[in-house]
A protein has these predicted regions:
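Extracellular/periplasmic carbohydrate-active domains that bind, remodel
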Residues: 17-515
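Sec-dependent N-terminal signal peptides
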Residues: 4-13
């Protein structure tokens, strides 16, 4: 009798830990996905929390958005953590806050009709050592951050708004005249070469950028001067374990939206991730050097790559040497983005064991995008993609671009690409990226500019790719270059112009079974 009573008590306690009121994802949901993987996928545990609640209203949070609620929200999180964990509740309302740090064993739950704005006041954001776009640098504190935390979650129905339009440079070419004038009137700032910057310091920092968006600064005092340029990613978890993000909306991030780095056991489910289509570096989710990840039933409508796998850039990424591995992406929709599902270009630590199933891409610049360039190094391998539909794709449905130049698909001139392609091929070294052992099947595409484009490196061709049961209607067909080991089985390309398939002389070991 005592044993039965004890078991019932344990069951009651465990049930209270993950009450459906605070999160709906179950371990069974995730286990069903991980068991379906084409590779050996470890169990991804759902974090559990004690049955204790802490309402930010009790700590002085202002639901009108007039006063900052940073201290109240952080106090609630800290108190919850100090007492062994539980759930911090942000009730219905409008909240203005600075950066908040999530702590171990804390679930942040947002009620319906709740929106959290992150104030763009630079004084609230400290500068610290960080990684951005795959290399070490300095950035401002991320609005939502966690460092080496375990068992953390953000759930509920609320919206997190990063106020990114106060941070991001903006190109006039991406706006209508009315939108441009409205932005200048509301935000002030300065304009240089038809690009808006929040202030002169941000423009100054741009002049120090030798490669993309990371300034090369040797004078430490200058970092504070150019602070407005050091846009943070909105959610940044580093070295964390057992993570759940569920049900909420993340939008309007200063740079990338969601960025777990060097984390383990991550579940993203039922999320709505949004950024304006013109947002500079407005990625959806960037999984960097993480393992055991499930992304399920999420919606993305963003300004850059939507669902992206990364692992560091060039020598710093290779030195870190942590791949992104064991990832499942299932039942996701992408509306706008530079790519629906993307590997790279920062993949120097490697990417392996990734399965993408049942995805829909509507109007993304590219559907499935694999990109890198000389100097990266790293290996992308064991990628399995099945069941993808895509429509209204203005560039490629499937793209392998090993001459990536840092611009969105379609933005680079033919002369720029030709200059890189015509350069003398170097010897294979640790700086040579490799893409191999990739299966893509059951893909349907309609209204695509070019169905498929493979452009590998002459010194390291794209290796061992299987394309099976694919149908695409496009303006142009499929073009393959620098590929070794290509299986084309039951693939139907319907081009409006030219040939359905074009294989350059640099393609080897091809087997084609066309419909």
């Amino acid at each position: 009798m005592k044993k039965i009573t004890y078991l019932l008590l344990v069951a009651a306690v465990l049930g209270a830990c993950n009450s459906p009121k605070f999160q709906t994802t179950t371990q069974r949901d995730i286990d069903q996905l991980t068991k379906s993987a084409c590779f050996e996928m470890p169990k991804v545990p759902i974090p559990a929390f004690p049955n204790r609640t802490y309402n930010v209203a009790d700590f002085g949070a202002d639901p009108t958005g007039i006063m900052l609620s940073t201290e109240a929200i952080q106090l609630a999180i800290d108190d919850c953590n100090a007492n062994g964990g539980g759930t911090v509740i942000i009730p219905e309302g409008i909240y203005m806050t600075g950066p908040i740090s999530l702590k171990s064993n804390v679930r942040l739950y947002t009620e319906k009709n709740c929106i959290i704005f992150f104030d763009h006041n630079l004084d609230l954001y400290d500068i610290y050592d960080e990684w951005f776009e795959g290399i070490p640098t300095k950035r401002c504190t991320s609005p939502i951050n966690a460092l080496y935390a375990e068992n953390i979650a953000i759930t509920g129905h609320g919206t997190f708004n990063g106020n990114g339009d106060w941070w991001r440079p903006l190109k006039k070419a991406k706006m209508t005249d009315a939108q441009w004038k409205k932005h200048l009137k509301e935000k002030g700032g300065i304009v240089d070469n038809n690009i808006w910057y929040p202030d002169s310091a941000s423009l100054l920092a741009q002049s120090y950028c030798l490669d993309q968006n990371v300034p090369v600064i040797t004078d430490d005092s200058l970092w504070q001067v150019v602070k407005s340029f050091l846009r943070p990613v909105m959610l940044h978890f580093v070295g964390c374990k057992n993570i759940l993000l569920e049900g909420v909306t993340f939008e309007n991030s200063p740079a990338w939206n969601l960025h777990p780095m060097c984390c383990e056991n991550i579940v993203l489910r039922d999320l709505n991730v949004r950024n304006p289509w013109y947002s500079q570096n407005g990625d959806g989710v960037d999984i960097e050097s993480c393992k055991n990840v499930v992304i399920s039933h999420c919606s993305f409508d963003v300004g850059d790559d939507a669902i992206c796998m990364k692992s560091g850039k060039d020598k710093p990424g290779r030195d870190r040497g942590i791949p992104t591995e064991n990832v499942i992406v299932d039942d996701c929709v992408v509306y706008h983005g530079h790519g629906g599902f993307v590997c790279g270009s920062e993949m120097s630590g490697g990417i392996k064991n990734v399965q993408v199933t049942n995805n829909l891409y509507i109007g993304t610049d590219v559907g499935l995008r694999f990109k890198s360039t000389r100097g990266r190094g790293g290996v992308v391998e064991n990628i399995y993609i099945k069941g993808v539909n895509m429509v209204n794709i203005p560039n490629e449905g499937l793209l392998f671009d090993l001459f990536y130049g840092g611009k969105a698909a379609g933005e680079e001139s033919e002369e720029e690409l030709a200059a890189r392609m015509n350069a003398t091929a170097p010897e294979v070294s640790e700086e040579t990226p490799a893409f191999r052992n990739i299966v893509i099947e059951d893909v349907t595409g309609m209204n695509i500019k070019r169905a498929i484009y493979f452009n590998g490196l002459p010194e390291m061709k794209i290796q061992n790719v299987t394309l099976r049961n694919i149908m695409m209607s496009a303006t142009y067909g499929a073009l393959f270059r620098q590929t070794d080991g290509l299986m084309i089985e039951d693939v139907l390309i319907l081009p409006k112009e030219g040939e359905a398939f074009t294989l350059a002389p640099t393609v080897e070991n091809v087997k084609i079974n066309k419909k």
